[in-house]
Amino acid sequence: MSSLSLVTPVWRREVALCALQCDSVDRHLSCYVKHHVIVPDDDLALFDRFNGVRRVVVPASELLPAWLRPMPRLLQHKGERYWWSLRTSPVSGSHVERIVKIAAASALAEDRHCILDPNIVFFRRFDLSPLLRPRPAPLVVTSLAGSPLQAQRMRTSRRLLGLTSASLPAIDFGGPIAVWDRRTARAMIERIEMVTGTEWVEALCCARNVCESMLYGCFVHDSVRHCAEHVPTSQTHCLRFAAAAPDRATIEATLRTAREDEVACSTAGLAATSIDKLSAVLAAQAEQEARVAPAAVSPSAVVPA
């Protein structure tokens, strides 16, 4: 039987966001086996409270090679931690996070993985069963829209995968909610190692402008077999707030008027005060749903034995 998990890489500065996401996942999502929250090893104690029946906090070291190790926090650069090794130059925490996502998608036991940014919060029910095999996995496809950084990431992905520069259109495959297939992720890793002649993690550590979603999308787009197991879509299932500091009324109105396919919202770029207001709105929503649920089973609806 097909299975699916949720995967969220998260850092210590995102503990509050993790709590908000976990609460929304528990309330609104169904048809997943486990929620894997991946954290740096020395942050395990901070996230231990999130362990549960359907959620496990995973130390990053379980997914990374032993030769890649975090530097002491005192050596952070511009607020970002770095990882070092004797094989490559130091790599940033954001670079390592991209590697962790690929490692999780290939190593975790479930057949498919729904990879979530830590700033994603669900506000509606989301049945994940349509994402299971044998149905094709959705692959978010959007235009690059002339982004220099994304164009560089496209070139890096093509090089790592051994693709010609003219073989792919100028499209992006990124999204705040991504669905990856384990078999596809493993095949992508094999391709990278075959093309580069090195272990895939080392190859990615030696590369610049690496983007995991671009790598995955380029690989799927170029593979007849794996392309057939995916279906392109423009739906991200996630809305963004128009302002950086919306008030409570604006947040309520935005969620209330969301499209039917929008089940989550992104807190990226939101002011801390607005994130607190969003949390309050979702808590009030949960209380209202709890009151409505018992009322749905009225005495008149009960058939006497």
What is the predicted role of each segment?
Residues 16, 42-48:
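Short, charged/polar "capping" segments at the starts of alpha-helices
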Residues 46-106:
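Active-site-proximal specificity loops/subdomain of glycosyltransferases
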Residues 1-23:
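N-proximal low-complexity "stem/linker" segments adjacent to membrane-targeting elements
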Residues 36-40:
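Short internal beta-strands
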Residues 193-305:
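A glycosyltransferase accessory/donor-loop signature
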Residues 126-202:
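Conserved catalytic core of nucleotide-sugar-dependent glycosyltransferases
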Residues 100-139:
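GT-A fold catalytic core of metal-dependent nucleotide-sugar glycosyltransferases
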Residues 23-32:
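Short, acidic, metal-binding catalytic loop of nucleotide-sugar glycosyltransferases
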